[in-house]
From Swiss-Prot:
Protein name: Centriolar satellite-associated tubulin polyglutamylase complex regulator 1
CDD domains: DD_C11orf49 (cd22959)
Organism: Bos taurus (Bovine)
Subunit structure: Interacts with PCM1. Interacts with TTLL1, TPGS1, TPGS2 and LRRC49; the interactions link CSTPP1 to the complex TPGC. Binds to alpha-tubulin.
GO cellular component, one term: cytoplasm
Described purpose of this protein according to its UniProt entry: Regulator of the tubulin polyglutamylase complex (TPGC) that controls cytoskeletal organization, nuclear shape, and cilium disassembly by balancing microtubule and actin assembly. Regulates the assembly and stability of the TPGC and thereby modulates polyglutamylation of the microtubule, which antagonizes MAP4 binding.
InterPro entries, A to Z: CSTPP1 (IPR038968)
Subcellular location: Cytoplasm, Cytoskeleton, Microtubule organizing center, Centrosome, Centriolar satellite; Cytoplasm, Cytoskeleton
Superkingdom of source: Eukaryota
UniProt KW Transmembrane helix keyword: no
Main location: cytoplasm
UniProt similarity note: Belongs to the CSTPP1 family.
Annotated region described as Required for interaction with PCM1, given as residue ranges: 1-111
Family matches, as PANTHER family: CENTRIOLAR SATELLITE-ASSOCIATED TUBULIN POLYGLUTAMYLASE COMPLEX REGULATOR 1, UPF0705 PROTEIN C11ORF49
Length: 326
């Protein structure tokens, strides 16, 4: 049911706020690319399943990075998908390197940029080498901040650098590739020089930044809470504080609390159901393998499986968007 606040918005403002046109344009593109396959199910059914997938957050699976980062909902959906797909890494206590986490990200988004993974790893590793091992939870919460608020953090990095160099903090900051976050590394202050910048002045600049820009920013009240606990801080100290802040994680709404990170009852139930379906099939195949002529049966099964594989020349459809749901 629509809330009164949504109904009070003008139609054009609601469309812009929810990025509806972005999804309509993407749906039409998918329709045109796969029109021959979709024609047998109907256009109405395709649009129904497409927007159902948007609501469920599965529409971002295996899509290009430009689409994954196109809207806040897409970013939150990607974070949730990454957590649900690979939480067993944390459940098993495995530690991975930055490169290994990047490979996991590329399983969901083949062209996911390495630079973004490196920035997330730097929040965790600080002064350590980039090939050091990280826990799943540490990387995930750092990645959440870096990925969801990437444009905000680029501007914050430029502001921090200007404050360090003594420039006017009220100057409008336009982040560029040369003023980006990758230039800033944790370092110890020189002898007699306080490290970092003054927290109160830093907050004033960030408050103005959130007012000026339309992209996603952490709630200003929570940013103020983070900065009110210290007198001075470094840029990466600020990012670490954001990644560990319980309220910011709740406000973003993509991931559970750290204590519940390894629990996903819905996914566990689905996996258990799939395992139960697979076991009888495996037992049947093992039993048949002991019977005379089992090789012929196995070969026939393989041929039947190969017949279901589409030819290499066929267009690759987005199955989650148009395949009929039984």
């Amino acid at each position: 049911m629509l809330s009164p606040e949504r109904l009070a918005l003008p139609d054009y403002e609601y469309l812009a706020q929810r990025h509806v046109l972005t999804y309509v344009e993407d749906a039409v593109c998918q329709l045109l690319e796969n029109k021959e396959d979709i024609s047998q199910y109907g256009i109405a059914r395709f649009f129904t399943e497409y927007f159902n997938s948007v609501c469920q957050g599965t529409h971002i699976l295996f899509r290009e990075f430009s689409f994954i980062q196109a809207t806040p909902h897409n970013r939150a959906s990607f974070l949730r998908a990454f957590w649900r797909c690979f939480r067993t890494v944390g459940k098993n206590g495995d530690l991975l390197t930055m490169r290994e986490y990047h490979c996991l990200l590329q399983l969901l988004c083949p062209d996911f940029p390495l630079e973004l993974t490196q920035k997330a790893a730097r929040i965790v590793l600080m002064d350590d080498a980039m090939d050091c091992l990280m826990s799943f939870s540490d990387f995930l919460f750092a990645f959440q901040i870096q990925f969801y608020y990437s444009e905000f953090l680029e501007s914050v990095a430029a502001i921090y650098q200007d404050l360090l160099s003594g420039k006017n903090p009220n100057t409008v900051i336009v982040p560029t590739s040369s003023s980006g976050q990758h230039r800033h590394r944790p370092s110890t202050g020189e002898a007699g020089t306080p490290e970092g910048v003054e927290a109160s002045l830093f907050y004033q600049c960030l408050e103005n930044l959130c007012d000026r820009h339309k992209y996603s920013c952490p709630p200003p009240a929570l940013v103020k809470e983070v900065l009110s606990n210290v007198q001075r801080l470094t840029f990466y100290g600020f990012l670490v504080a954001l990644s560990k802040h319980h309220g910011i994680n709740q406000a973003l709404g993509a991931l559970p609390d750290k204590g519940d990170l390894m629990h996903d009852p819905a996914m566990d139930e689905e996996l258990e159901r799939l395992v139960l379906r697979w076991r009888p099939h495996r037992s049947s195949r093992q039993h048949r393998a002991k019977e005379p002529g089992a090789f012929g049966y196995q070969r026939r099964d393989k041929l039947e499986a190969l017949q279901t594989v589409p030819p290499a020349s066929a267009p690759t459809p987005c199955l989650y968007q148009w395949e009929p749901i039984e």
